[in-house]
Swiss-Prot record:
Gene Ontology MF terms in the entry: proton-transporting ATP synthase activity, rotational mechanism
Family from the record: Belongs to the ATPase delta chain family.
InterPro entries: ATP_synth_OSCP/delta_N_sf, ATPase_OSCP/d_CS, ATPase_OSCP/dsu
PROSITE patterns (UniProt xref): ATPASE_DELTA (PS00389)
Subunit structure: F-type ATPases have 2 components, F(1) - the catalytic core - and F(0) - the membrane proton channel. F(1) has five subunits: alpha(3), beta(3), gamma(1), delta(1), epsilon(1). F(0) has three main subunits: a(1), b(2) and c(10-14). The alpha and beta chains form an alternating ring which encloses part of the gamma chain. F(1) is attached to F(0) by a central stalk formed by the gamma and epsilon chains, while a peripheral stalk is formed by the delta and b chains.
Organism of this sequence: Bacillus cereus (strain G9842)
Protein name stated in the entry: ATP synthase subunit delta
Gene Ontology terms: cellular component: plasma membrane; proton-transporting ATP synthase complex
Subcellular location field: Cell membrane
Chief location bin: membrane
Gene name as annotated: atpH
Amino acid sequence: MSNGIVAKRYAVALFKIAKEKHVLEMFEEELRLVQNVYVKNGELHSFLTQPNISKEQKKTFLANVFGSVSESILNTLYILIDNKRIDILPEIADEYVVLANEERNVADATVYSIRLLSEEEKLNIAEAFAKRTGKDAIRVKNVVDEDLLGGIKVRIGNRIYDGSLQGKLARIQRELMKNR
């Protein structure tokens, strides 16, 4: 079975527990924290995937590192260790965020711009794209892309809205080539 399918199953299980306990936001924050630490700390990743370190040692280590997270999240980490699936932790967190966003009718957007956007600009973009996508809210993450000449690119899920200068120039070029 592919890692994506397995990750989705774990995410769905966590989502059901979170919904039942009314802690969608808390689980999301905790999963993002655990994901961030796991992805950015190569030593942690190496330790947890070492076959010569016992499962009990790994669980004790996880309890020490992530002792502040909820019992459900910690138990999920233990299950991942038992099933030798800790490597799909980032995918589980991503799948959980997708499920939680669907439940709240929220979308995450990555906005690429030539410079950091002000809070007001982010808010305006969020409002405009919330209407356009039919979502209640859009959470904006701003990424500076110095390769842009101007304008912005907005990525929401698998869709890209290209309002960059390069995008406009490319569209003009296609039109000119088509009309030759």
